[in-house]
């Protein structure tokens, strides 16, 4: 077969072990953030106007604003965004917020009001566009730039609005009785609770205040007692029949009861059921079929029933008995005495239907609507006397006013589902029917019908993403603004003003700023590596405003719930107090328009699994039978097994295959991105998997990234979606490449008005939020063809477009002289020498020159009392050179500050007389390197205030920046020219000309040669006969000129920005930022980890020759303790070791075949070997169709080790691992003979050796080690400060004091508690003694003792210290300490 496929070597090829084909495309991993914010902002107005959501909805809900008299009204028309002033990179550099100005068009309508009739007529309409502050924009990567730092708004999980039914689990009452309660939670507004008490009376509470009987609430809704009873109970008519009564026979109420007396048919008089017989459904059905209509009852059978209506004498209007009264001898007597022979009776039997509402009604003191309203008013506003108007207004504003109460669309949908209603989701307030339905449902629950809700079910929790959080915040800002507008409208002469004069946008802008700056959900982005960025954006937090608090959250909320399956990862959550409160979205999950998390499923039609994908939320999923993704299937999509493991209604069960409706799309849909990156996750204990997924987020990007041999296939997805690796925006040809940018001439999407050139700027040695290094390297070369989405450049922690957090290291599991005790890690010196785990960290130092009271500070090289040696790295402006090597104490930026006049010593006077003013009036406040940091200066930025003269350094930086911009412009211009003139010559070729440049003969047929005689700029002068072509030529000319001027304009704008001064904080004249790159080699004390939660600290770095070695003389790189595996149960690391060993073995074979090919030129063995490794799975590469160059490229990629992918829950099994080991020509035990590097002797047993992917974590000993002799002290206690940041001391605590006491080290102890701590006078004396060379000193009184005395005095205790001499005779009698 002809080898036709080509492979460009810019992506990593893996052998896939997965057997399950993936039907659904994995959604973009940061979709949650981007979609939510786009929906909120809606920057581009769609045709037909914006729908009512997001920002539009906020404006619509607050406007129109009318003044108090109704004489004028401010209406909202529309809003638009202007382009942002600075782009993302400029905002990062200048510490600005990346935001776009928001302009809102408002319309002010002034009315004429007729004083007599009150009729309004429009007098004047004014429309104006008003600036409403800046609205932060989201970058392409789903982050915000606030004051120059990248932040992420974490999505919040909160309880969905709607109605919830619950009980107290028998905890409230000593009898253990279940007290049921219902709660209606709106999106905003008052909560309504309806609950039972221990006596089975139903109460309502508004906003958790004092409870009132629920019947009072119903009365306030306009119902009376009889109507309430009618609503909740059925009624039957009992008729007088001779001496007894005729009762309707209702079989549904008698089910399961026992006949106490014999039951007699009222019509025939025969006994239909004997006394004591059980009434089974079958018996009741037989009685109905016989035609039994009514039963006969005696008077005493009526006792205990309740009247369903008032018993009234209609002629006199006298009420004998009221609805709800109980029937007993007395009441029955009244009824019979007044000649009533029909009684309406409530259908309460105390078994199926309880008398709760009737009892509540009889216990309720309120008789009518007014009493009920007054009662509610007193509960809500205690101490205010109610009037009917105020009580009614207050009650209506609680639940029935759209301004104050909003269920939201979600709330309404949830309520409809729970209460079986069908109300449009535009009805966002409560209705009387809703309240009645809630009470009815609650009473049914008490009667034993229905189920309570599970509040931890994901159907009852929803996600609030950026857009929604921002919407709520902006609404608050606008409401604050609304008050001010109303007041201003009333106080100002309304006829003369424009909307601009009424509006002060400060509150709205402040609300936005406050949200992004200080909300608990607006977090400093975790930017250690691309994975940590992506996980941070996909995080779901139950904390934050309107959410839970750590202390109050119980076990249930934190626990894994069956509905988490495919929606929230059960593994990835922090260890510690936040466990279970902060979660991560599962890989395939997405958030629907109501904020519920949905997971994808494949449809099953007629017992066959289709490729049709359906997204369902937890509520919808419950009714289906869902098969697992790894259920065995036949070729036609039917299930192999008769019974299939499936999930249904939150249970895992075996069910017949015919009952299946859906199937999971992929085994990894259960876990989050980080957990899906762990190979053999299925063989790890959950606790260790949790640590593994959390530690991958802390892996520092290494100097040389290397993708893992054993991956899971998720690596390219993470690298692409995180934005670390640069993907092509559209197809084209690479025109230029250097380390800082890639220029591509586009060949697709060439629309008019769009540049035909894509310039990708690469980030070079930029600092991330966590001080790790962000650096991108190009992968393409000039002339390469690229398609949309191809990887052009690798970023931090990526290798050929694959996520690469660590390095593959050769590991042996064996003890080694105790150096790997307790999870310590033993490393070979080779790892240090070859920079395997070396990383670059970039630290930023900034210094500001302020304007002080005594005069301006100055950044200069001229610093008093500093040697020339100390200034060797500074330029003439006093700023350090780029490339300078600096160490602790070196000056980075020289700065002097004026100091106040102080009395001068004679020497100073003399100096002043000789040298003039300068010597004494400034002090050195230069920026110096902090202790413990060594590095190289990689970048310096200088910022000047407007109007402050720029120094030499600032000018040089500016020139460099402008040159860079000019180069971009020139390159883009060159490509534009090449494209346009190429098209122009195509159009002119073969045309008859009618005009041309000077000296051109008319009528000549144009060809390349003819046209090329003239300079390109004159080609536009050619005119041709063909009018169609001529008009195309003119259109091309117009397009070209427009593109050219747009390019020039863009360049001028950028240059203007560079040259303009910078915005500075008040009082700052000039600011310098210095970036220092620190190279960190691995050293003892650094923390390392694998991907399976196997973490440890480097204990020693051993010379290569002392490390254990294999039979071929290869020394291992890492020695791990085998005891770290059994108790931790993370066997995944062992399988990874074996498979990595096989990969390296295969790589060695491929390397040998490459050498053979170079010798004999036969590529077929190489192609065959690679083909055998790749195999023929659903995702296998067609290596047999690769052309020769492509095979070589792939072989070159694999010669260090073959890359494989073993997806979670669908990866390599033991047999696959054995096959790979055999294929690589290795023993299938995966063990090898090792020799001791120091003695050369063979170790007793075979040792497991292989390759593990090791990470270096961001817990480096250099950042933690810290020592102090003298330093800053606390003001009050005069004790040294604590912590590395404050250059503090170590706390000598209570237990350390015990230790010294135990050793009897009295003087050491005294020194610790006085001189070394807070004895101010003593420490000065010690210093003086040391200077004198004396080593005796005396301790004084510790300052903390003085603090104690002062505290006691402030309590009013008179504490005096008396110096009394002790009598020697008395002293002799005191016990000796030594005894």
From Swiss-Prot:
Superkingdom, natural source: Bacteria
Keyword Nuclease attributed: no
InterPro entries cross-referenced by the UniProt entry: DNA-dir_RNA_pol_bsu_ext_1_sf, DNA-dir_RNA_pol_bsu_external_1, DNA-dir_RNA_pol_su2, DNA-dir_RNAP_su2_dom, DNA-dir_RNAP_su2_hyb_sf, RNA_pol_bsu_bac, RNA_pol_bsu_CS, RNA_pol_bsu_protrusion
Assigned keywords, A-Z: DNA-directed RNA polymerase, Nucleotidyltransferase, Transcription, Transferase
One GO molecular-function entry: DNA binding
Catalyzed reactions: RNA(n) + a ribonucleoside 5'-triphosphate = RNA(n+1) + diphosphate
Broad enzyme group: transferase
SUPFAM superfamilies in the record: beta and beta-prime subunits of DNA dependent RNA-polymerase (SSF64484)
Gene Ontology biological-process annotations: DNA-templated transcription
EC number: 2.7.7.6
GO cellular component: DNA-directed RNA polymerase complex
PROSITE patterns in alphabetical order: RNA_POL_BETA
Function field: DNA-dependent RNA polymerase catalyzes the transcription of DNA into RNA using the four ribonucleoside triphosphates as substrates.
Listed HAMAP family: RNApol_bact_RpoB
Oligomeric form and interacting partners: The RNAP catalytic core consists of 2 alpha, 1 beta, 1 beta' and 1 omega subunit. When a sigma factor is associated with the core the holoenzyme is formed, which can initiate transcription.
Family listed: Belongs to the RNA polymerase beta chain family.
NCBIfam families: PRK00405.1, rpoB
Protein name: DNA-directed RNA polymerase subunit beta
Lineage: Bacteria, Pseudomonadati, Pseudomonadota, Alphaproteobacteria, Hyphomicrobiales
């Amino acid at each position: 077969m002809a080898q036709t496929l080509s492979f460009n070597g810019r992506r990593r090829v893996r052998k896939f072990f997965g057997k399950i084909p993936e039907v659904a495309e994995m959604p973009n991993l940061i979709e949650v953030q981007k979609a939510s914010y786009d929906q909120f902002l809606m920057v581009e107005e769609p045709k037909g106007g914006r729908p009512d959501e997001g920002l539009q909805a906020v404006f619509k809900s607050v406007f129109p604003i009318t003044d108090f008299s109704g004489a004028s009204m401010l209406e909202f028309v529309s809003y638009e965004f202007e382009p942002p002033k600075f782009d993302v990179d400029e905002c990062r550099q200048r510490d600005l917020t990346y935001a776009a100005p928001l302009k809102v068009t408002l319309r002010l309508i002034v009315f004429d009001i007729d004083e007599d009739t009150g009729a309004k007529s429009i007098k004047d309409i004014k429309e104006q566009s008003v600036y409403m502050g800046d609205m932060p924009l989201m970058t392409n990567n789903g982050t915000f730039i606030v004051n120059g730092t990248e932040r992420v708004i974490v999505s919040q999980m909160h309880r969905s609005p709607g109605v919830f039914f619950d009980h107290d689990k028998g905890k409230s009452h000593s009898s253990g009785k279940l007290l049921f309660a219902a709660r209606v939670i709106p999106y905003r507004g008052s909560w309504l609770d309806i609950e039972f008490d221990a006596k089975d009376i139903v109460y309502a509470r508004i906003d958790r205040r004092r409870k009132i009987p629920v019947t009072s609430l119903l009365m306030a809704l306009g119902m009376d007692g009889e109507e309430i009873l009618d609503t909740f109970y059925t009624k039957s008519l009992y008729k007088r029949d001779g001496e007894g009564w005729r009762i309707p026979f209702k079989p549904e109420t008698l089910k399961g009861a026992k006949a106490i007396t014999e039951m007699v048919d009222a019509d025939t008089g025969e006994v239909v059921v004997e006394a004591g017989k059980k009434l089974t459904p079958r018996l009741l059905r037989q009685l109905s079929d016989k035609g039994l209509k009514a039963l006969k009852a005696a008077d005493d059978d009526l006792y205990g029933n309740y009247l369903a209506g008032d018993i009234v004498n209609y002629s006199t209007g006298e009420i004998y008995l009221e609805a709800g009264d109980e029937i007993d001898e007395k009441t029955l007597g009244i009824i019979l005495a007044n000649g009533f022979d029909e009684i309406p009776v409530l259908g309460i039997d105390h078994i199926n239907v309880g008398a709760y509402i009737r009892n509540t009604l009889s216990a309720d003191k309120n008789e009518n609507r007014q009493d009920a309203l007054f009662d509610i008013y007193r509960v809500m506003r205690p101490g205010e006397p109610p009037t009917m108007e105020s009580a009614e207004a207050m009650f209506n504003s609680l639940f029935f006013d759209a301004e104050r109460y909003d269920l939201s669309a979600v709330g309404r949908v949830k309520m409809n589902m729970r209460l079986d209603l069908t109300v449009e989701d535009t009805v966002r307030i409560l209705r009387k029917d809703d309240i009645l339905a809630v009470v009815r449902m609650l009473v049914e629950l008490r009667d034993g019908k229905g189920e309570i809700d599970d509040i931890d079910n994901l159907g009852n929790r929803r996600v609030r993403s950026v857009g929604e959080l921002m919407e709520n915040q902006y609404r608050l800002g606008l409401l604050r603004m609304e008050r001010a507008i109303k007041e201003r409208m009333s106080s100002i002469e309304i006829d003369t003003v424009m909307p601009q004069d009424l509006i002060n946008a400060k509150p709205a802008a402040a609300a936005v700023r406050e949200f992004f700056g200080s909300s608990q959900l607006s977090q400093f982005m975790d930017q250690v590596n691309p994975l940590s960025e992506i996980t941070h954006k996909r995080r779901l937090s139950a904390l934050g405003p309107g959410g839970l608090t750590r202390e109050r959250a119980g076990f249930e909320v934190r626990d894994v719930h069956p509905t988490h399956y495919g929606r929230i990862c059960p593994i990835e959550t922090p260890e510690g107090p936040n466990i279970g409160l902060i979660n991560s979205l599962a890989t395939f999950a997405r958030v629907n328009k109501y904020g519920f998390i949905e997971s994808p499923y494949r449809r099953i039609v007629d017992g066959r699994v289709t490729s049709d994908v359906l997204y369902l939320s937890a509520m919808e999923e419950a009714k289906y039978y869902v098969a697992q993704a790894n259920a065995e299937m036949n070729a036609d999509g039917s299930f192999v097994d008769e019974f299939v493991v499936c999930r249904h209604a939150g249970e895992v069960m075996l069910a017949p295959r015919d009952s299946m409706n859906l199937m999971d799309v992929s085994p990894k849909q259960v876990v989050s991105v980080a957990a899906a990156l762990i190979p053999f996750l299925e063989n790890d204990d959950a606790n260790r998997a949790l640590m593994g997924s959390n530690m991958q987020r802390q892996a520092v990007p290494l100097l040389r990234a290397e993708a893992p041999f054993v991956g899971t296939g998720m690596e390219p997805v993470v690298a692409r979606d995180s934005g670390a690796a640069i993907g092509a925006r559209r197809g084209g040809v690479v025109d230029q490449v250097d380390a800082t940018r890639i220029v591509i001439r586009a060949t697709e999407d060439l629309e008019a008005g769009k540049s035909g050139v894509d310039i990708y700027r690469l980030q070079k040695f930029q600092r991330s939020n966590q001080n790790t290094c962000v650096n991108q390297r190009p992968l393409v070369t000039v002339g390469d063809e690229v398609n949309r989405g191809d990887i052009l450049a690798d970023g931090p922690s990526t290798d050929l477009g694959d996520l690469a957090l660590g390095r593959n290291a050769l590991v042996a599991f064996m003890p080694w002289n105790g150096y790997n005790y307790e999870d310590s890690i033993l490393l070979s010196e080779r790892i240090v020498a070859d920079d395997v785990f070396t990383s670059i960290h970039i630290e930023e130092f900034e210094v500001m020159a302020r304007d002080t009271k005594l005069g301006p500070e100055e950044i200069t090289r001229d610093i008093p009392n500093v040697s020339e040696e100390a200034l060797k790295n500074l330029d003439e402006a006093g700023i350090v050179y780029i490339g300078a090597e600096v160490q602790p104490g070196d000056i980075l930026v020289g700065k002097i500050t004026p100091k106040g006049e102080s009395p001068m010593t004679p020497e100073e006077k003399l100096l002043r007389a000789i040298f003039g003013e300068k010597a004494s009036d400034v002090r050195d406040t230069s920026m110096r390197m902090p202790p413990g940091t060594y590095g190289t200066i990689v970048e310096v930025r200088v910022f000047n205030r407007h109007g402050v003269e720029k120094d030499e350094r600032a000018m040089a930086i500016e020139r460099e920046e402008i040159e860079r911009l000019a180069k971009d412009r020139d390159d883009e211009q060159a490509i534009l020219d090449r494209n346009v003139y190429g098209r122009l010559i195509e159009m002119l070729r073969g045309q008859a000309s009618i005009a041309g440049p000077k000296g051109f003969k008319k009528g000549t047929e144009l060809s390349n040669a003819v046209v090329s005689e003239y300079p390109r700029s004159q080609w536009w002068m050619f005119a041709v006969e063909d009018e169609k072509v001529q008009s195309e030529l003119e259109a091309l000319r117009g397009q070209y000129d427009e593109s050219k001027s747009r390019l020039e304009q863009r360049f001028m704008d950028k240059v203007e920005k560079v040259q303009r001064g910078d915005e500075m904080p008040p009082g700052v004249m000039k600011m310098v930022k210095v970036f220092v790159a620190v190279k960190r080699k691995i050293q003892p004390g650094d923390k390392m980890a694998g991907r399976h939660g196997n973490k440890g600290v480097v204990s020693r770095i051993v010379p290569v020759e002392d490390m254990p070695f294999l039979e071929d003389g290869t020394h291992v790189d890492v020695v791990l303790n085998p005891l770290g595996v059994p108790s931790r149960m993370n066997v995944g690391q062992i399988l990874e070791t074996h498979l990595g060993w096989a990969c390296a073995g295969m790589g060695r074979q491929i390397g040998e075949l490459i050498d053979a090919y170079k010798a004999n030129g036969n590529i077929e063995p190489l192609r065959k070997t690679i083909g055998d490794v790749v195999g023929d799975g659903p995702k296998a590469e067609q290596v047999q169709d690769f052309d020769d160059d492509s095979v070589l490229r792939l072989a070159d990629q694999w010669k260090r080790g073959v890359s494989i992918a073993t997806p979670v829950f669908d990866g390599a099994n033991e047999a696959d691992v054995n096959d790979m080991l055999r294929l690589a020509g290795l023993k299938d035990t995966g063990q090898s003979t090792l020799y001791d590097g120091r003695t050369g002797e063979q170790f007793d047993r075979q040792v497991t050796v292989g390759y593990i992917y090791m990470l270096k974590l961001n817990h480096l000993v250099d950042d933690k080690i810290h020592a102090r002799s003298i330093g800053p002290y606390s003001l009050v206690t005069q004790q040294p400060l604590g912590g590395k940041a404050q250059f503090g001391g170590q706390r000598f605590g209570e237990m350390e004091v015990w230790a010294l006491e135990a050793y009897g080290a009295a003087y050491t102890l005294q020194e610790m508690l006085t001189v070394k701590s807070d004895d101010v006078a003593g420490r000065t004396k010690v210093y003086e003694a040391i200077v004198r060379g004396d080593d005796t000193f005396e301790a004084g009184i510790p300052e903390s003792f003085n603090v104690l005395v002062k505290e006691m005095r402030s309590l009013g205790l008179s504490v005096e210290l008396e110096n009394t001499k002790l009598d020697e005779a008395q002293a002799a009698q005191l016990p000796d300490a030594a005894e």
